[in-house]
Amino acid sequence: MKPLLGTFYLLGMLVPGWLGYDRSLTQQRQEVVDKVVSPWSILETYSYNRYHPMGEIYQWMSEIREKYTEVVTQHFLGMTYESRPMYYLKISQPSSNPKKIIWMDCGIHAREWIAPAFCQWFVKEILQNYEDNSRIRRLLKNLDFYVLPVLNIDGYIYTWTTDRLWRKSRSSHNNGTCFGTDLNRNFDASWCSIGASHNCESLTFCGTGPMSEPETKAVSSFIESKKENIACFLTMHSYGQLILVPYGYTKNKSNNHEELIQVGQKAANALKAKHGTNYRVGSSADILYATSGSSRDWARDIGIPFSYTFELRDNGTYGFVLPETQIQATCEETMEAVLSVLDDVYEKYWYTNSARKAKSTALVLGLLMSFMSLL
């Protein structure tokens, strides 16, 4: 930990109940951010090969927004159970044409630290390379990226202060006798029907009802409002080295299952080509275990065509406590996989439509010329 940031790391723990309710919500959430960020800039020396506490991630988001004002905006999504603000970054180039949205969230399970590390890596790679890398430039010209670096902020902070292997959120249940909901069992996708528990002490406690948690409400409300334009929903997890497609709650397949598998396998091949890491591709019900209430299945159920869960390194040697020495390689190979998925989304939703428009235009011009020749 950098000496200058030590104090702000501690402030980043944010004791619940701090916010005064006589102030506006905007003032409240700004106070939270003000109290966890350092007055010194961290961006120039920010290491993407380290895990960062939430205070540093808040500050990183603010400084990324300030440095790349031409393409980055920061947006409020909602408040966590313990009254911390949830922000996402929108990376977008101005365009006169409608653009499809790519959604990516990380850290829905608190202990999976490599996931937020990848979200930060993804943002860094896009912003540092979009001007010179033709592949990224083409994608950003036609797609908007919405990135939520840490979804389960309360739980993530708890893994830094108290229990490194904490999984759930930090909501209170049974009169304060047990804590936390598995946010990836709380979405309205065959909620709590299989692979989840109604026991609040369970790691897979599904909550008191679908979307019962403020974090899942915030995400689902936003996604619902944009679903007509969202082409791809990516949620990053660990561990297991898997690319999962819907569904977890049934062995039945989505109506575009073969396409999802094909795109996913291509991504796994791109990932393997980087460092030789093997990933398996399939539905959770087929290659992992049955689950209900996942964000991936919910996203597909509401009509988002491409919906994937990435389970990053490793296969169990280190499990959730993946060493920092593996961050770079993990992020490099995952970046190749994600770009492969985005290439396919681009081909389907932009290139194909453009080609169709060009063909229609050529047909109209041909008919017009034929008509003119008869005059």
Curated annotation (Swiss-Prot):
Q: Which residues are glycosylated?
A: N175, N252, N315
Which residues are in the Peptidase M14 domain?
Answer: 50-345
Keyword Lipoprotein included in the entry's annotation: yes
Q: What is this protein called?
A: Carboxypeptidase O
List the taxonomic lineage.
Eukaryota, Metazoa, Chordata, Craniata, Vertebrata
> Which coenzymes or cofactors are required?
Zn(2+)
- BP-aspect Gene Ontology terms: proteolysis
Q: Which GO terms describe its cellular component?
A: apical plasma membrane; extracellular space; side of membrane
| GO molecular function per UniProt | metallocarboxypeptidase activity; zinc ion binding
Q: Which gene encodes it?
A: CPO
Family membership, please give it. Belongs to the peptidase M14 family.
From the Swiss-Prot or TrEMBL record, state where the protein is found. Apical cell membrane
Role summary: Carboxypeptidase which preferentially cleaves C-terminal acidic residues from peptides and proteins. Can also cleave C-terminal hydrophobic amino acids, with a preference for small residues over large residues.
Specify the domain of life of the species encoding this protein.
Eukaryota
The record places the active site at: E311
Q: What is an example of a Pfam family matching this protein?
A: Peptidase_M14
